[in-house]
Amino acid sequence: MAYPAKLSRAAIIQAAIKMVEEDAAEPPSLRAIARRLHVATNALYNYFPDRSELNAAIAVAGSRRMLSSLKRAVGNAEGRDELDRFSKAFLRFTRTHPQLYDFLNENHPTGQEAAALFQEWAEIMNRAWSPFYLPERMPKVIFTHAALLHGMTTLERLWQWRNARGHFDFANQMLLDALVSSKHAKRGPKKTGATVEIPLPWAP
């Protein structure tokens, strides 16, 4: 049986992400995606046998989209500037794509593709923090940084915190200042070009 020429795994995922961003009341079903793509629902089962596999694919694609956005924002920055750019880009993405960010927090994919993606997250965060901390401290430092970013996202969106963006700038500066100047931090940080594999707290 020939499948419609417009149907592909990438097209299905792209449609699903668009639906998540339009209405995140619940994850898009295969039937709803089929209607969006004007194909029979059965045709989608050739790519995704069930919703769990579909949700995992959406999460991987969405997380990669977020990571790409952060990488572009960070660019070739180094040191403290790199940390500032990462924080601001993270918040900018969560503000621009709130439904997708919620979906990523509710769906944690496993498998080789997800593991490779999580390693990319580890690399960008390790690159930002490695000038300041030794590997054994890195997981706790990264967790602290991530907790601030996620917490500010929650306060701004769910509590509708007044002047949240200004408060975030202050909190971000205070936390980064504290971490960079901590007694546990390295003294006289230098870039070595080496990347140490750091397991992230949320990695599969």
Predicted regions span which residues?
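Amphipathic alpha-helical segments used for helix-helix packing
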Residues: 91-112, 154-162
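Amphipathic alpha-helical packing segments from all-alpha helical-bundle domains
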Residues: 108-144, 166-177
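Amphipathic C-terminal alpha-helical segment
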Residues: 96, 146-164, 177-189
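Alpha-helical DNA-contacting segments of helix-turn-helix folds
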Residues: 20, 54-62, 104, 108, ...
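N-terminal intrinsically disordered/low-complexity leader segments
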Residues: 1-7, 18, 183-204
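Generic hydrophobic, amphipathic alpha-helix propensity
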Residues: 8-16, 33, 58-66, 70, ...
